[in-house]
């Protein structure tokens, strides 16, 4: 994951949280590969609730929820991704804009599909 902008210090607690969140993402991916989607969802949802500042848990959850037809959940996660990633200090402004644009496009496509 990209570092913070120059001059912004990360606290020890923030570092520990980031490491725990990253470990949960890896556990979530392993759970998905093993076919345990409920465990994967729980791990990703915790990171979403904590505002993990990278796209992996949001993208994985949206994919799972869309496959299940749980479009309300997919929309909720997309909106949270846009909120968290737009405010993240862990990426450059250009990276933030690009990532947020991807999630906004996914949200628009989901909403169009729902109206469809």
Question: At which residue positions do the language-model features occur?
Answer:
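TPR-adjacent "capping" and linker segments in tetratricopeptide-repeat scaffold/adaptor proteins
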Residues: 7-23
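Structural register within alpha-helical repeat arrays
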Residues: 20, 27, 60-61, 107
């Amino acid at each position: 994951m990209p570092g913070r902008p120059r001059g912004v210090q990360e606290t020890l607690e923030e570092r520990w949280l980031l490491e725990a969140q990253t470990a949960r993402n890896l556990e979530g991916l392993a759970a998905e590969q093993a076919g345990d989607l409920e465990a994967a969802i729980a791990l990703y949802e915790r990171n979403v609730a904590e505002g993990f500042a990278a796209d992996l848990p949001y993208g994985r959850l949206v994919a799972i929820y869309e496959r299940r037809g749980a479009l309300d959940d997919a929309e909720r996660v997309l909106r949270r991704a846009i909120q968290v990633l737009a405010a993240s200090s862990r990426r450059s402004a250009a990276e933030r804009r690009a990532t947020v644009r991807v999630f906004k496009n996914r949200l628009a496509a989901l909403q169009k599909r729902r109206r469809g």
